[in-house]
């Protein structure tokens, strides 16, 4: 699983990660991750809010410096083109599939548009 990892990688490194995973995966192998279709733009305001919460606790960290901006390849199509069967679900659908409602809070609002990716190597 590469959940929570992709936004911390430069766009080219994201592609290389999935290229390496594909090269090393036998048929039937699985990978799971999430993808933010609007990139890090949607995360910016929330990251600043979260950064302020950390600062209030004495942690001097600019969270926006931890993520990489830039145009990324959408993960689902990228994996499909490389021989993976891909299932994509919006975050609210994932919550509903587990019988949960999506929380209405500032902290998780930035995840509302994220897409959960599950893929099986063909």
PLM regions and their residue ranges:
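Alpha-helical subdomain
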Residues: 1-122
